[in-house]
């Protein structure tokens, strides 16, 4: 099995996201997006709206990792936004 490179978008410099994504599009296997609601875990991070916007520049699938109290509330919005994996 070939190792996969799946960078977390939570750690990106969001002011330079287009430039960084252009580089990663040529090197990564998929993108990892953490979805946190501030309840299940204390952090609040990226959202279905971010996934929708990012999917327009991503050339690799987007994998969303749910750390939320009610995962069912996120599945359809993330799928509609362009997430390839949830």
What do the PLM-derived regions correspond to, one by one?
Residues 1-85:
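Conserved N-terminal beta1-alpha1 strand-loop-helix module at the mouth
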